[in-house]
Amino acid sequence: MASSSNKDDSLKNLFSGSSSKRRNFEVTPDVTPVARIKVLGVGGGGGNALNRMIKSNIKGIEFIAVNTDAQALYHNEAPVKINIGKATTRGLGAGSHPDVGRQAAEESSEEIKQALDGAEMVFITCGLGGGTGTGAAPVIAELARDMGILTVGVITKPFTFEGHRRRTQAEEGLENLKNKVDTLITIPNDKILSLIDKKTPLTEAFMVVDDVLRQGVQGISDLITVHGMINVDFADVKAIMENAGSALMGIGYGTGETRATDAARAAVESPLLELDIQGAKGILFNITGGSDLSMFEVDEAARIITE
């Protein structure tokens, strides 16, 4: 067996050749660039969700806050901020009127397109029922799709206690949005009540809403941007989500010996799912665990999800 020094000499000779016939080799790695992903938080609810994502240090995403309320934008942590409809609202908000939100987005369409430029995938997140998110989100989504960008809406519907008007406006906004995006993930806030304790303060309940929106975005974006045991690239995600229509989201956690299967069952039976997932045309799932997570556990979890 050759010594390590002889091995090194052999490698040098293999790649460099003799001193009299030395050649220079340039190795270009075959690396596919990661898709450029942008998240637009629209209105108050979208802006709050954006702040939650930023604090969670989600990697590989560009954050853009969009609002008619200049003061809310000032306090937002997104590096890019667009105050839409300055002539329409003078930076004072949409007053819970979706028509004003729509007009504001149309007024600022060129600025929005500049912010969208270069993206392969865009998430539009907002809370439906108010003025800016409900009115502006469909306009932004249409601009994005017209630019050839894979467009995903991740939105919430208001709590019942928020009143009839907001619920009605949310349903109208949902109808306007669903045909403007490739995939629409809808999360009814009332379903989130089942995830929290009855004594949870109102402010904390809305923080849970923000975090569910964060998980909806991160669960998909991590598939593309984070290196895992089994890698999924942007083309795989696009094949599932392009022109997919309505989508459902489930979240599950598990600990102990049966952690993977427990998490999978919890996700499949998640209260966030309004419908049974049987008959789904496609599915994306992201399994995250410690360094001791085994391939056997992943296989068991995948079987539960796909069967």
Regions found by a protein language model. Give the residues of each.
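Tubulin/FtsZ superfamily GTPase core signature
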Residues: A2-E307
